[in-house]
């Protein structure tokens, strides 16, 4: 049968295995740039961040030319403004897929992730603003027997 234990000292102690919070370190490539990918809807953006004068380039164009609507320009600049780093980084992005709104969101997501790779201290500010979270909303698929994803065909009684 099992041996009886007379006291807790005989049982011994369990080693504490506290999982320490992950330490975020600076991740740079050979040219001193931080790289990240951002996604939104069907758009995928590849973003490089390096210290500079604040120039933002999207697909080899100035971002004001690529995203003509002011709303899209504002979306793109949100993580930079939230982290008070305007005019400190040059950002180069290549984005493909989706429409302009999805592409702007993808570049914003990529900029946020690249900024945290370059400067890990910004992570709390950007996470609180919701810039590091991938927006998982995508278009709902069309179903057969329906006009669109949910809209039914017009019904006629007679």
Curated annotation (Swiss-Prot):
Pfam families named in the record: Ribosomal_S9 (PF00380)
GO-annotated cellular components: cytosolic small ribosomal subunit
NCBIfam families linked: PRK00132.1
InterPro entries: Ribosomal_Su5_D2-typ_SF, Ribosomal_uS9, Ribosomal_uS9_bac/plastid, Ribosomal_uS9_CS, Ribsml_uS5_D2-typ_fold_subgr
Alphabetized PANTHER family for the sequence: RIBOSOMAL PROTEIN S9, SMALL RIBOSOMAL SUBUNIT PROTEIN US9M
Source organism per UniProt: Brucella abortus (strain 2308)
Protein name: Small ribosomal subunit protein uS9
Biological processes per GO annotation: translation
Source domain of life: Bacteria
Gene behind the chain: rpsI
């Amino acid at each position: 049968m099992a041996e009886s234990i007379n006291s807790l000292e005989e049982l011994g102690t369990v080693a504490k295995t506290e999982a320490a919070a992950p330490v975020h370190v600076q991740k740079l490539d050979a040219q001193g740039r931080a790289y990240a990918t951002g996604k939104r809807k069907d758009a995928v953006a590849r973003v490089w961040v390096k210290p500079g004068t604040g120039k933002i380039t999207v697909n080899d164009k100035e971002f004001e030319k690529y995203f003509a609507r002011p709303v899209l320009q504002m979306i793109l600049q949100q993580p930079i403004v939230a982290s008070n780093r305007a005019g400190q980084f040059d950002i180069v992005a290549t984005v493909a897929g989706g429409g302009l709104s999805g592409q702007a969101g993808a570049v914003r997501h990529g900029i946020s992730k690249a900024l945290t790779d370059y400067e890990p201290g910004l992570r709390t500010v950007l996470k609180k603003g919701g810039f590091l979270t991938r927006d998982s909303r995508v278009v709902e698929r069309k179903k057969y027997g329906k006009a669109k994803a949910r809209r039914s065909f017009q019904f006629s009684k007679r």
